[in-house]
Amino acid sequence: MTITLCGGGNLGHVLAGYLSSQPGTTVSLLTSRPSAWSSSLEVSDSQGRIYRGSLQQISANPADVIPTAQIVLLCLPGYAFQSVMEAIAPYLSPSTWVGSVVSSTGFFFQAGCHLPPGQPLFGFQRVPFISRIAEYGHRAELKGYKDSLSVAVLPPTSESSESGAAMLSHFLSLFHVPVRRLDSIYQASLSNSNPLLHTSRLYTLWHNWQPSITYPDCPMFYSDWTLEASHLYLAMDDELQHLARILGLPPGSIPTVLDYYESTDAESLTAKLRSIQGFRGIPSPMRQTDAGWQPDLQSRYFHEDFPCGLRYPWQLARQHSLATPNIDKVYHWGMKMINSTQ
């Protein structure tokens, strides 16, 4: 199987090393920094396992790595989808599956605009790994696995060719966990993961912030999670679940926050988020100034999770005349913060 990964962030590093270590796979990489990468990669996990793999080709030119790919997997922030899709589109075979490791940042919506009509698509509902770069282009840490994966497919595999469906199934088997096929792309596109998780935390941290305000320290994003953030997160999830029902999704097709985190209320959710091993050591997105700490409005938490994440449930709710007061206030605040830097 020939796979091309697009993007060299945390997930791109781990997937490059992990997938290229699997028997029968050939992995290439499309990246804007090809000279920073070694062809030999090492990925270590918290149980002491080490995955060693080799990349066949590393290039900034889609013509080098896209035409031979059977699977193209985007490991990109949502704001990079358009430019990369437009760059790879001329080199795609009609049978090549194009997927995204993150679907909740507009993957299916953007693909419909920037990839050839009828291109086979797939997207993960949640990322398969918690990932961190250890040494750029050389080593990465796989900090957490998922017990199962859920994937949306367009067109549904029942409408795909038999060989195409088999190819996608073989690729997904490389993750060695059960894989569930989702009923609708909305189940992957409308996520209560980062678009709600991150934005609810950011809002409760800094909704009263002004440029003149500095803070004495930088709190941990998850280890210092607050009850206030949990209450807002759950309120936004309630609105997302209502939207899912309006869109005709089966009950439970997007697991509630409480179900996903095995919690019963805001208090137990707070304790859960504070205790997740893979989340430990992740700071809030801040920058240090001479006077103290301030929010880093240039971070991906802002530039991805608001305009490329929360935007889509907010937009769909407007289209269906659904009141979502909590999503509205968080989305408008986040966009105001981003626009204040432009």
What are the residue ranges of the model-derived segments?
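NAD(P)+-binding Rossmann beta1-loop-alpha1 motif at the extreme N-terminus of oxidoreductases
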Residues: M1-I50
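Short, surface-exposed amphipathic charged segments that create phosphate/polyanion-binding patches used
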Residues: A134-K143, N192-T199
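NAD(P)-dependent Rossmann-like dehydrogenase/reductase catalytic/cofactor-binding core
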Residues: P216, S223, S230-Q342
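Residues at the C-termini of beta-strands that transition into short coil/loop
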Residues: T31-R33, P62, V102, Q125, ...
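Rossmann-like NAD(P)(H) cofactor-binding subdomain of soluble oxidoreductases
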Residues: I71-L74, G78-A140
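A short helix-to-beta-strand connector/capping loop
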Residues: G48-Q57, P117-P120
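Active-site-lining helix/loop region of Rossmann-like oxidoreductase modules
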Residues: V151-V257
